[in-house]
Amino acid sequence: MSLNAYEVFVAIAERGSLAAAAHQLNLSASAVSHALASFEQELGFTLLVRNRSGIRLTAGGEALLPTVRELLQCNDKLMQQAAKLLGLESGTVRIGAFSSVGVAWLPKIIRSFADLYPKIEVTIEQGGYDDVAEWIIKSQVDLGFIILPEPPGLDVTPLYADPLLCIAPLGFAPKTKAYITAPELADHNVVLQGKDYGKETEQILAKHKISVRSSARAIDDAAIIAIVESGLGISVMPQLALLNYRGAVQVFPFYPAESRVIVLASLSQESLAPAAKAMHQHIVKFVAGWSNGNDKGGSQS
């Protein structure tokens, strides 16, 4: 069995087709098909089943996929350690993140990391909180940004307590002029985030045992701001999500203050490959500087 066969199997499983896997690996379709067939022959059972909707893993394929991913990670770690002994810094770091981190932090993190380690490749996958946690657990990414509480089995480093704010259309007046209380949400139409994207709002509602009415849901931060701007309701948004968006909305803090705790997660910090470990340290240092006001930017109306 070869590493090439492992790479082919994982690429097909993740991309859902032989053609997409071939494109990703820069191989011909016939080379991908041959590598898969040889792998299946050595194993003695089929890994994939082709049907009209595409390709799906067999039970055997599902069972082997996590182990094959781990083998590839171990090989990458070995090559990085060998490169480090030669005085080089190389490898690949895969990061999972939700939208506001992807917009507010990651561009600066990647740029500054590239200045330090120009030979390390960084790839980004964006999704909801649960998506990112699942990618970490399945070894599809090395590091991921999620919020507390974290799923069992993840190693997390707290990064930042991100204040939660209420955004409202112009002309909106809370009971006090300076802030809004969580129970007041029940008095208004609330624009909610889509499933897996609004856990912080769900946590506030559950914490205060509040039931709200909602006529709109959206995943994209900009879409939520636009819906609120149009006068269709108010919404709860993290401060980080508002830094890079402008809109004709009012922003009110909660009293008592509400927040989400953003953490950097991995399967195990100790077992991270050198490149991923360097990125982990870089992210922690960056966010510490950012939260102290060294690199904040953006504004909102």
Identify the residue ranges that each predicted region occupies.
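Central regulatory/effector-binding core of bacterial HTH transcription factors
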Residues: S90-P152, A218
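Beta-alpha-beta core module
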Residues: G153-P158, D162, A223-S271
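Short helix-boundary/capping micro-motifs
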Residues: A11-S28
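A short LG(V/I)-centered, amphipathic sequence patch enriched
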Residues: E40-A59
